[in-house]
Amino acid sequence: MSATKSAGPTTLANHLDKEVKTDVLGAIDSDKLTEATQGDHKAINEEYKIWKKNSPYLYNVVIATVMDHPTLTVEWLPDLFDDITPGSMSARLMFGSHSSGLDKDYIHVASVELPTHLRPETIGLLSQQEGGTDMKQHHDAHGRHKRIAIVQSIYEDGEVNVARYNPLASKQIAAAHVTGDIHIFDRNNIMNSKEEAKPIYNLKHHTKEGWGLNWNINHADQLVSGAIDSTVAFWKIPEAASDGSCKDVTPHTVYHHDAAVNDVKFSYKMDFLIGSASDDCTLRLWDTRKPGNKAACTIKESRGINSLDFNPHSEFLVATGSADETVKVWDMRKMDTPISQLYSHCDEVTKVQWCPHQPSVLASGGHDRAILVWDIARLHDDLSSDENDEGPPELLFHHGGHSSRISDFDWHPTLPWVIASAAEDNVIQVWRMAESISNDEAVPADDVDMED
């Protein structure tokens, strides 16, 4: 079911409009929103108004905030806390700041207040706080309650293109800079400070900036990076210095493309396999067990490939997002042609990511301001003529809440269907599509919980 299918009683829409007045999302400061979108075309603003009006029918939760500067990176941390507010829990979201030299730049960790009903009963709370409770309620300068609030800031001397936490040592955060250097921090040992944070590792190789950065989920000491300098660097991180001093690290192996490298990933199932996507129109697979730097497999597309992601549930599936506006799904056992090509974006696709909870579901985002959620298991579903007009059968949901290009998005690792997304207009959103869409079953209108 696509987003345009959702419907609900007119009385509910009227009620919500009265309750929240002009701001369905509540957390967005209306003045900042006007400033952030004033340069946009009238058509984009009209699309946003339509989306906002229909939001009560499309989502269980939508939370949004406007930052002082845009972020190019967003990622959920695994931490979950009981919240001091009854019926709420706190998640942690990491993002950066990209001030273009106008201000200091940071890696931020924010508390995100979410309703507890989003958590499956089988998932317990993970906490680094005694008692497992986030004891603070967060407010803005005007005393208004904030659903998304920064709780830690790591000051960096330079803009951060991408930041990723180590899934086997979540206190470690790797950050790729505009200089090409990669810093690794221990976030537990860094307090909020106006002084530049001291990394525990400095990874030096890339001569230009990059956006590709990924930890090996099977080996805590392995990291891969990619940059505009056309190289892919495979790193093996040594033991940290006992005195806390910074260690310089050089790559274990360097692989090469013929143009800028846009994305890099380790396979979830085959821990020796690295994939890289490049402006040279290729997806290349690298076997870290083999000496030398020759690609084990190369896939050629018609235009540059911006993103890739290995399926965490199937060792053979890999998805790509490309400048040709398509998402493709490949079977690594037969890479001569994709097993699925997904068409609905109307501009470059810059990010693809498989859902950690559903083997056949993935999301994509790009320059068309949209995040699309797909279910490739629906590829051969028969649709009615009305349904067919709304898009291909694989298109499960269209998130249209952003008014600028998508910078990054991330599925929450333990909260099913919860996504955080960021766009170039400084807006960060946290959302969960309605259960009537994700589960293909009706949910009473009273169960729709619009968070502000």
From Swiss-Prot:
Xref: Pfam families: CAF1C_H4-bd, WD40
Molecular function GO terms recorded: histone binding
WD repeats: 155-195, 205-245, 256-296, 300-340, 344-384, 401-441
The UniProt record lists the keyword Metal-binding: no
Protein localization: Cytoplasm; Nucleus
Keywords on record: Chromatin regulator, Cytoplasm, Nucleus, Repeat, WD repeat
Gene3D superfamilies (alphabetical): YVTN repeat-like/Quinoprotein amine dehydrogenase
Superkingdom field: Eukaryota
GO biological process: chromatin remodeling; regulation of DNA-templated transcription
One GO cellular component, as annotated: Rpd3L-Expanded complex
Function summary: Regulatory subunit of the histone acetylase B (HAT-B) complex. The complex acetylates 'Lys-12' of histone H4 which is required for telomeric silencing.
Similarity comment text for this entry: Belongs to the WD repeat RBAP46/RBAP48/MSI1 family.
Known partners and oligomeric status: Component of the HAT-B complex composed of at least HAT1 and HAT2. The HAT-B complex binds to histone H4 tail.
The protein, known as: Histone acetyltransferase type B subunit 2
Organism: Yarrowia lipolytica (strain CLIB 122 / E 150) (Yeast)
Lineage of the species this protein comes from: Eukaryota, Fungi, Dikarya, Ascomycota, Saccharomycotina
Gene of this entry: HAT2
